[in-house]
């Protein structure tokens, strides 16, 4: 630890400004098992030493400020300060570093993602000495993660409630996302569910607009769910978006969903906020509702490689805040997502223990200590030809959602749903028989087309559709 002579009561107070690195850069520090660890991608301004910038990040996100203050002498600074304990240059970049910072657990309120992020990604991101700053990863120690409830129910409980095992769940976002009346919206839900999907979904910006108020939508969707369940003998659901302008209104919508007996609701956790999300997760846990989480606004925060917060951090904090599902990208669809990076944060969402693996962007070993898992949701520009890759990439514990890939079927919504269900079951069967979907996936789909005219029609419509653009956020 660096000496703090000027801030200890016995040494007296010395006013003035000093380098951050004299106090907050501690390369000899031995990390404690209870420390919260952060990895920042840091780009200093020209002429600013990396050690000074790393120390500034540690200081400004914990106990420090720009000048010495006399009240430093009234606290145990060595106990509470953040420490930049390691720096490593980023390969291939001339002035970029990974700064590792350790934060004492006592700096953070128990069970509060809001407080955690307010400290770690607060004012420091506007610090002038930094050209850019990105939070790449967090290590949440068991001593802190055990103060969070996590997902309302988790993957296994959801499987048991749905009585569906051994395959990915299938969903569909109702389109057009805005403009339908509640009755027509409910009709689309019914057709998709009776066609073979497990879930349908409100889009992220479906709340309670003049063309479709939330209560009407909830009632018509519930009617569709019950009718489809009766016809198919399967448990069905629709993600009813409870996101609202106030927490009181959000609770009202969640309560109504519970009263009419639907199995799952939805929340936009970034636009709605972590405090609202944690509160809603607790309500869902107490009232038997599954909670689907949409990540609207995430790309504003995580898409740029050099500045912001990586999605793996947003995924970790959502698991702590509470969510049974979370949109995670597709790798193969229309939305940003590199394969190894995506697989890394998918594991962080649903596995109990994840080893450090820099090849997948995982900077720290993460032990969730029994916290329930969050199911990844692949959604955005996917269709039946993507099914082999999605099955191979995500495995069984995922929800694959085909919006346009269901509702765009030339024969209608129910045939579109049937095409996706047939494609999924064909891929799962082929995988279980030992076939390599990465090489034989196209053949598997073509074989299934022989006994499913719905799938054959879907394959013909989308045979030329690809989204091949270079990924911006790479390792």
Swiss-Prot record:
GO biological process, alphabetically ordered: photorespiration; reductive pentose-phosphate cycle
Active site positions: 175 (proton acceptor), 294 (proton acceptor)
GO CC list: chloroplast
HAMAP family named among the record's database cross-references: RuBisCO_L_type1 (MF_01338)
Description of how the protein assembles with itself and partners: Heterohexadecamer of 8 large chains and 8 small chains; disulfide-linked. The disulfide link is formed within the large subunit homodimers.
Family recorded in the similarity comment: Belongs to the RuBisCO large chain family. Type I subfamily.
Protein name stated in the entry: Ribulose bisphosphate carboxylase large chain
Organism classification: Eukaryota, Discoba, Euglenozoa, Euglenida, Spirocuta
């Amino acid at each position: 630890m660096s000496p703090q002579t000027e801030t200890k009561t016995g040494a007296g107070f010395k006013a003035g400004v000093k380098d951050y690195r004299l106090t907050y850069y501690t390369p000899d520090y031995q990390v404690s098992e209870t420390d919260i660890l952060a990895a920042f991608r840091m780009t200093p301004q020209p002429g600013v030493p990396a050690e000074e910038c790393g120390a500034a990040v540690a200081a400004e996100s914990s106990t420090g400020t720009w000048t010495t203050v006399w009240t430093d002498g009234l606290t145990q600074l060595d106990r509470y300060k953040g420490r930049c304990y390691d720096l490593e240059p980023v390969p291939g970049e001339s002035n970029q570093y990974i700064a590792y910072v350790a934060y004492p657990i006592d700096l953070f309120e128990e069970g509060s993602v809001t407080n955690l992020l307010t400290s770690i990604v607060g004012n420091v991101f506007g610090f002038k000495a930094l050209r850019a700053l990105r939070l790449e990863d967090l290590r949440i120690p068991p001593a802190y993660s055990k103060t969070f409830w996590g997902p309302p129910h988790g993957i296994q409980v959801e499987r048991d409630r749905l009585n569906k095992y051994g395959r990915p769940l299938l969903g569909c976002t109702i389109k057009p996302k805005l403009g339908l009346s509640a009755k027509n919206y409910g009709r689309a839900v019914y057709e998709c569910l009776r066609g073979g999907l497990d879930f349908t979904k409100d889009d992220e910006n479906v709340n309670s607009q003049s063309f479709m108020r939330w209560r009407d939508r909830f009632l018509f969707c519930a009617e569709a769910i019950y009718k489809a369940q009766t016809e198919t003998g399967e448990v069905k659901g629709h993600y009813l978006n409870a996101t609202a302008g106030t927490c009181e209104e959000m609770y009202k919508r969640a309560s109504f969903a519970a009263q009419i007996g639907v199995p799952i609701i939805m929340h936009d956790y970034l636009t709605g906020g972590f405090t609202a999300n944690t509160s809603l997760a607790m309500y869902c846990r107490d009232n038997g509702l599954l909670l689907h989480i949409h990540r609207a606004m995430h790309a504003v925060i995580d898409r740029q490689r050099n500045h912001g917060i990586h999605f793996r951090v947003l995924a970790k904090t959502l698991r702590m805040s509470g969510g049974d599902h979370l949109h995670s990208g597709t790798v193969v669809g229309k939305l940003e997502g590199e394969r190894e990076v995506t697989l890394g944060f998918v594991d962080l969402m649903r596995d109990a223990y994840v080893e450090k693996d820099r090849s997948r962007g995982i900077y720290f070993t993460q032990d969730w200590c029994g916290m329930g898992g969050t199911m990844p949701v692949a959604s955005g520009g996917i269709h039946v030809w993507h099914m082999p890759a999605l099955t191979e990439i995500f495995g069984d514990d995922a929800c694959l959602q085909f919006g346009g890939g269901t509702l765009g079927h030339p024969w209608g919504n129910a045939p579109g749903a049937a095409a996706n269900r047939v494609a999924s079951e064909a891929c799962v069967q082929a995988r279980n028989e030992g076939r390599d979907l990465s090489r034989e996936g196209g053949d598997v789909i073509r074989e299934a087309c022989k006994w499913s005219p719905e799938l054959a029609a879907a394959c013909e419509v989308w045979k030329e559709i690809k989204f091949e653009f270079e990924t911006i956020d790479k390792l």
